[in-house]
Every structure is written in C-alpha cells, then in structure tokens.
Amino acid sequence: MRSKHLVTLFIITFLSFSTVKVWGKDVFAGFVTKKLKTLLDCNFALYYNFKGNGPDAGSFLDFVDEPEQFYWFVEHFLSVKFRVPKHLKDKNIHNFTPCLNRSWVSEFLKEYEEPFVNPVMKFLDKEQRLFFTYNFGDVEPQGKYTYFPVKEFHKYCILPPLIKTNIKDGESGEFLKYQLNKEEYKVFLSSVGSQMTAIKNLYSTVEDEQRKQLLKVIIENESTNDISVQCPTYNIKLHYTKECANSNNILKCIDEFLRKTCEKKTESKHPSADLCEHLQFLFESLKNPYLDNFKKFMTNSDFTLIKPQSVWNVPIFDIYKPKNYLDSVQNLDTECFKKLNSKNLIFLSFHDDIPNNPYYNVELQEIVKLSTYTYSIFDKLYNFFFVFKKSGAPISPVSVKELSHNITDFSFKEDNSEIQCQNVRKSLDLEVDVETMKGIAAEKLCKIIEKFILTKDDASKPEKSDIHRGFRILCILISTHVEAYNIVRQLLNMESMISLTRYTSLYIHKFFKSVTLLKGNFLYKNNKAIRYSRACSKASLHVPSVLYRRNIYIPETFLSLYLGLSNLVSSNPSSPFFEYAIIEFLVTYYNKGSEKFVLYFISIISVLYINEYYYEQLSCFYPKEFELIKSRMIHPNIVDRILKGIDNLMKSTRYDKMRTMYLDFESSDIFSREKVFTALYNFDSFIKTNEQLKKKNLEEISEIPVQLETSNDGIGYRKQDVLYETDKPQTMDEASYEETVDEDAHHVNEKQHSAHFLDAIAEKDILEEKTKDQDLEIELYKYMGPLKEQSKSTSAASTSDEISGSEGPSTESTSTGNQGEDKTTDNTYKEMEELEEAEGTSNLKKGLEFYKSSLKLDQLDKEKPKKKKSKRKKKRDSSSDRILLEESKTFTSENEL
C-alpha cells in the first residue's frame, strides 16, 4: 500500500516538475509539439537553402530587433502550405516528406487561440539561432539589411567613376569601359573643364601602358561615339528598425548612423563603415569648404548630409519576395531585405535642410495578430469559432424577474426643462449645404488618419486591434453628425428632398473603401492609411443602420433623430426599459463574437449624443427653428439618464464581459460627454474655415455597389429606393483633370461641378435614359404629392399619412401654410407632369445645382384628407414596453401577496 502511495507521489512530482520546466521559461514550448517542431525545421531548411547552393549564412532574419523580417518569414513560409520548389526537389537537402501540405501557423493556432506576438517572435528567434549554429558553427548571425543606394555628393561621384562608351572592342566585341581607381579619380577631380578634358588630363598621368592605350582609343573616338562618366552605386546598409527606432525621420536616421560609424571607423565592423573612408578621400581631394563642412557635420547634429534628390513616392521601400532572390537579372544580395524605391533618390549635400515631408518619416512595422496570416478561409473560420468557444458562455436574455428587481422607477421619462444656454458653446452653422458637409467630413477624416498614422506612440493601440483607440469613435461620430445635419435641414425645409436617399455615411463608406481615390489627400498607398480607411469605411456603414432602422428603407425615420433607433431596439427613449432594450440588442451581436457589437455600440451612443447636441444648439441659437422640430429630438436630460443607465448596466456583473470586450478594441471616451462634444466642436470649426468651404466638389466614387455582410445589418439597397441622376458620372481621368484646375476658377464654377451621387446599382442594371428618368419622377411623387392617375394619388396619400404619423412621443403637427404655397405646389405638379412628356431628359441635375420642385415637408399634410387624431399615436412606439410593464407589475404584486 505504501509503495502505491510512493509511486503516485513520484508521478505527481514528475508531472509537476515537467510542467514547470515546460512553461517556466518558454510560454509556447508546451504547444510546439514534435510535429510542429519538425514542420518548423522544414521551413528553416527550405528557407536557408532556397537558392540551391547550400545553406546561406546571409539569409539570417532578425525576428526580435526587426519585426518586419519576422512577419515576412511568417507570410512567405510559415503561413502557407509547405511545398518544395522544383529546383530543390532533386537535391538531398532535408527530409521534407512529413511537412508537405502543412501550414505551421494554422496548426499552431489550433493549439493556442491567439497568442501575444512578442513571445512568439522570441521563441522562433531562439529556434532559428539553434538551426543557424548547427549549420554554420561559430559564425555570428547578422540580420538582413535595408539598402539605401546613393551615388553622388553634389555632382561628384562618391566612388571612383566608370567611363562607359559605345566603342566596340575588336577582339571581344564588347563595349569599351574604363574603371578609375582612387589615384586616377584624384587626378580626375583636380582637372578643370569638361569631362573629356579631365579624361585627357588623366591620360597624361597614367603609367600603365595597357590602361593608357584604352584611354587613347576612347579619346580618339570622342567625336564619333557616345562617351559618358557614370557614378557607381554605393548601398548604405542599415538594420532599419534597430538603427532608426530613436529617430523620427529616415534621412536624419542615416545622418546619425554616419556620425556614429565615422567616429569609430577604425574599430567598426559594419559593412557600411568604408563609406567614411570614401567620403574622407573625396573631401580631401576637393579640399575646402567640403572638408570643414564634414567636420561640422560630425560634431553638430543640426548639420545634415543626406538629402532627397527627388520627390518621394509610395511605397517608400521595395520589399522582395523569395522568388526575387532567384532572379539572375536582379542579382540581389542575400543579405538585402528591402531597398529604397528606385524612384526615391537620395544624394549627399551640405546645402539646405531636410524638407518637411511625412514621406521621410520612419515607417516601422506594427505588431499584427498572427491569425492575420492564416492560410485559408477555412483556417480563419476555424480560428474564429475556436476563439469564440473559449471565450465563455454567451449572455442569456434578460427576464421579467430581473427587470422587476433592477428597475426601481417604472415611470416614463419626461423632461421639458429649458436648456441653460450660458453653458452651451455656439458651434452649429445651418447655412452649409449637405453636399458640402459630406466632402468636408471626408477631408476631416483624412486629416485624422494622417495624425494617427504619423504618430509613433503605440500606447493607445488596443491589444486585439491594429487601429488606435478612439479612431472608430471619431469616424462614427462625424458620420452621425453630418447624417443628423441632413435630417435637421430636411425638417426645416432647407435642403433639396433628393438628399434624403443620399446617405452621408454611404458616401464616406465608399470614399474610404475606394482607397485608390485617396491620392492627394494623405499618404496614398500607405499600408497603415489603407487599414485605417477600411476601418472607417466599415464603421460608418452602421450609422444609417441605427438612424434609419437597419436595412429597411422607411421614409418616416427621416423625420426624427431617434425614431430609427427606437425601431431598431423596439423601444422608446421615454420608456423605463429603453436602456435594457439597447443592451439586449447589443447582446445578440456580442454572443456572435463579432466586431459589429463594437460598431453598433458606438453608433447607438453617438446617435444619443447627437440628439443632445442638436437639441442644445437649436434651443439656444436657433429658437424659431427649434420650436418647429423640438419634438423630433430627445431632451438632453433624458439623454444623460439613458447614457448613465447604459454605462451602469455595462459595469454590472451580468454585462461586464461586454464592457471588457469593448475595451479590448476601443476607448472608454465614448462615455465622456466632454470629449465627445469637443470632437463635435472641432469638426464644426473645421467646417467654418474658408479653405474648406471652397471645396464643394465631392470625390468621384466608383460604381461598385456596397456589399453587406448579412441581410439584416447595415443599409440594404432596393432599386426603388435609389434616386438616379441624369448626368453620367465622370471618368477617373476627368476627375483627376479637375483636380489640377485653378482654385479660383474652381470656386467660380463650383455649381457647375457639383457633387456626383454614388450610384448604388451596377451600370449593367441601369435602364435606358428615358425609362430611368421616368422611374425617378414617379418615385419622387411618393414624397411630393399625388400623380394624375388616381392610383398614384392614393399611394402618395397613404405615404403622407405614414410620414405624418411617425413623430414619436409628444409630437404635434408643425405644418403651416397659406394659399400662395398651395398654388406653388399645384404649379410644381404641372411642371413635373411636363417633365414626363419631355424627350427622356430630366431637369434633375447633380447635387444642389438645380431642382424643379421645392415642395416642403409641411405641405404634405395639405394633400391628405383630414383625419381625427388618434389618442394612441403618442405612445405608438412603446406598446411592447407597456406590455412588459404590466407583466412586471403583475409579478411584483404576486410577490407581495
């Protein structure tokens, strides 16, 4: 019996010890099974022998100090299915058979859901160094370099030049060329006159007869042949991330590297240390003032040497793929990881300063999740569900019992108190048209993206996202602001009715989705900029989902800043259950584990803030307009109660997991009224600048329709909901041409170059011009009044009834009018009827340039038969809440009994 206990104790001790050993120093050792270790060795063997000439020590990748090299190896080797290239199949390099058709990243993520990347880097770096030591012994591994090609100091070659000709050698048949050595180059530099004069001067000093004879042939054929002096390229080699981590500018980084290297040139083993010798030789040959300037450069960090020779383009660097190293034409050095783009030239000069341009800023690799590199859609889906499965049980729906215990006040929210205007800052300008606001909103978001991608502070980046905290909030908040602005101007009859279906958020969505159109706005083709623009594109699509009730086109939701939200969550802001209704709506997306939970959450909170913002601005600074649309907004005090209630619910034990998930991706600033309103005020200030108000032309957007992820989320398209325009959209060439037009001329003709509405339907689906215009005019009657035919009149009247009955709680009719307006309306109908009889051409122009009908929303009530007001209309949206209220009261009374 005692022996059994001893055996048991020994086994437990052994297992505990082995566990500590596995998990103590190396987090991933427990997951890197023998199969994964074998697969990793296969990838290392394939990579180091990729050229087929045996293992190459210059192929070492520095995974820790150069994260970009780590991601390169993951992308091209570890994340793809393992295959042996044709040129290596016949060579006995390694036993690759157990590794075929396997992906290391996919198998690793099945063992570990989503690891922190830094420990993975260190683990793979350790494994690579073991492989390197096994194959190369005591050779010290050096990570690959970033190459910066440079040729000239001013007009002088840094290296001794090469004389090239088109004179053919009689024996070899090749063109004659002459490579100068250092002594010859010194003579060449001391010569006065043209290049041929310098060559002739050089000829008189050369002692080697064979080289002298070659120069003689070149000089004798001067008049009949092409002779040029070309500077060889010197590649400055840097460990880019390591060397430039403390500098915010690429050119200054190279300057600093040269100072450090040239100060200790005698002891430096760096491959670019000999550049100091070449420069010293050149400056001594040229003498003053260059030698003195070089000494100043060595001691003064404000003195610069590396300068851009051309305007830089993107991408700034050329990063090579494995196949590029096999290309005999490119003839790449194995130790070269990436190289400055051939269009981005640099040279050496002591004149002028480094230009202030964001392209010269250091572009360091961001930390990206490993799951980004999963090989196939199947892998991505597997990892998604695997992570979700490990995240815990979903949140169950709230019960009536819980509601009765958690809600202490079952009365409906009411507040008619006046706003304290002394505490409200005037910010809103109602005179700017919606089309202009769209363009300015996109421009402002471009500026925000510039700010985020040019900052080096990664502290604000969440662990589970590569987008700065707060960016999605700003994107959605600005989209909501402009979307609500459109509704307000509609309610005040200040906007063309055609803008009803031109969702501002869809313009922003397509603007940022079409990243090829961002040239000239900010860092074009910059990977970070594209990532941020796509995030904003996706986020902004959720704004109309909240304001206009998902993907269902309901005209009545345009008549309120909160009715779409009420319909979305099936509750009313005045209801005591409204906060729970919002949370329960979000729970459905949280349980799916999707990003939509975060985006819907921000959009809903933004809509609530926007109600408060417009209520305050209109109440304090536009009193007449405020009285017209007071009932279409939520009172700020009610908004504050709702926001506080949502915040408290998110902090509760039941919904705490939702808050944690949100904070993994985004900032808690969404609950700070001060920060939200500061963002709104900043955008309003941006609008008011004269420079921005001139930019009334919206960007030309491609005709690619918006692809929604599901049929229930976002805004869907139906042909009958889209208002077409007569004028065909410009081509991309025309759009780019307009960008070059003089700004004054652009301002004069701004109405002639109004914005193009992004077409939601593909071109192949669009009908002929005549049919299209007639469909448009018929569709407009839904919102503008009856047609000649009785059937159309009935349809329009019913639509008007629906619009007038959708005002929400405590809504009173604001329609006013006189006989003159009725006559105007009748004339409008006649004009529209004449349009139908025209030769298929419509007078509906782009943007706000011209619109025949100026029918006002308050005129819709005049066209419908008068009906008795329903007493139930006031609380129409809260019927479900009433039922729930009765159930909870019943439950409470039963408990009391």
UniProtKB/Swiss-Prot annotation:
<keyword id="KW-0812">Transmembrane</keyword>
<dbReference type="GO" id="GO:0044409">
    <property type="term" value="P:symbiont entry into host"/>
</dbReference>
<comment type="function">
    <text>Participates in the formation of new permeability pathways in Plasmodium-infected erythrocytes enabling the uptake of nutrients from the blood plasma. Required for maintaining invasion capacity of merozoites. Required for the trophozoite to schizont developmental transition of the intracellular parasite.</text>
</comment>
<feature type="compositionally biased region" description="Low complexity">
    <location>
        <begin position="802"/>
        <end position="817"/>
    </location>
</feature>
<keyword id="KW-1043">Host membrane</keyword>
<feature type="region of interest" description="Disordered">
    <location>
        <begin position="788"/>
        <end position="845"/>
    </location>
</feature>
<dbReference type="GO" id="GO:0031410">
    <property type="term" value="C:cytoplasmic vesicle"/>
</dbReference>
<dbReference type="GO" id="GO:0020008">
    <property type="term" value="C:rhoptry"/>
</dbReference>
<dbReference type="InterPro" id="IPR054451">
    <property type="entry name" value="RhopH3_C"/>
</dbReference>
<protein>
    <recommendedName>
        <fullName>High molecular weight rhoptry protein 3</fullName>
    </recommendedName>
</protein>
<feature type="compositionally biased region" description="Polar residues">
    <location>
        <begin position="792"/>
        <end position="801"/>
    </location>
</feature>
<dbReference type="GO" id="GO:0005576">
    <property type="term" value="C:extracellular region"/>
</dbReference>
<comment type="subunit">
    <text>Component of the RhopH complex. RhopH complex is composed of CLAG3.1/CLAG3.2, RhopH2 and RhopH3 with a 1:1:1 subunit stoichiometry. Interacts with CLAG3.1/CLAG3.2. Interacts with CDPK1; the interaction promotes RhopH3 phosphorylation in merozoites.</text>
</comment>
<feature type="compositionally biased region" description="Basic and acidic residues">
    <location>
        <begin position="877"/>
        <end position="889"/>
    </location>
</feature>
<dbReference type="GO" id="GO:0020005">
    <property type="term" value="C:symbiont-containing vacuole membrane"/>
</dbReference>
<feature type="disulfide bond">
    <location>
        <begin position="157"/>
        <end position="231"/>
    </location>
</feature>
<feature type="compositionally biased region" description="Basic and acidic residues">
    <location>
        <begin position="820"/>
        <end position="832"/>
    </location>
</feature>
<keyword id="KW-0472">Membrane</keyword>
<feature type="compositionally biased region" description="Basic residues">
    <location>
        <begin position="865"/>
        <end position="876"/>
    </location>
</feature>
<keyword id="KW-0968">Cytoplasmic vesicle</keyword>
<keyword id="KW-1015">Disulfide bond</keyword>
<keyword id="KW-0963">Cytoplasm</keyword>
<feature type="modified residue" description="Phosphoserine; by CDPK1">
    <location>
        <position position="804"/>
    </location>
</feature>
<feature type="disulfide bond">
    <location>
        <begin position="421"/>
        <end position="620"/>
    </location>
</feature>
<feature type="region of interest" description="Disordered">
    <location>
        <begin position="859"/>
        <end position="897"/>
    </location>
</feature>
<keyword id="KW-1133">Transmembrane helix</keyword>
<keyword id="KW-1032">Host cell membrane</keyword>
<feature type="disulfide bond">
    <location>
        <begin position="262"/>
        <end position="276"/>
    </location>
</feature>
<dbReference type="GO" id="GO:0085017">
    <property type="term" value="P:entry into host cell by a symbiont-containing vacuole"/>
</dbReference>
<keyword id="KW-0732">Signal</keyword>
<feature type="disulfide bond">
    <location>
        <begin position="475"/>
        <end position="536"/>
    </location>
</feature>
<keyword id="KW-0597">Phosphoprotein</keyword>
<feature type="signal peptide">
    <location>
        <begin position="1"/>
        <end position="24"/>
    </location>
</feature>
<dbReference type="Pfam" id="PF22808">
    <property type="entry name" value="RhopH3_C"/>
</dbReference>
<dbReference type="GO" id="GO:0005886">
    <property type="term" value="C:plasma membrane"/>
</dbReference>
<feature type="disulfide bond">
    <location>
        <begin position="244"/>
        <end position="253"/>
    </location>
</feature>
<keyword id="KW-0813">Transport</keyword>
<feature type="transmembrane region" description="Helical">
    <location>
        <begin position="597"/>
        <end position="615"/>
    </location>
</feature>
<dbReference type="GO" id="GO:0020002">
    <property type="term" value="C:host cell plasma membrane"/>
</dbReference>
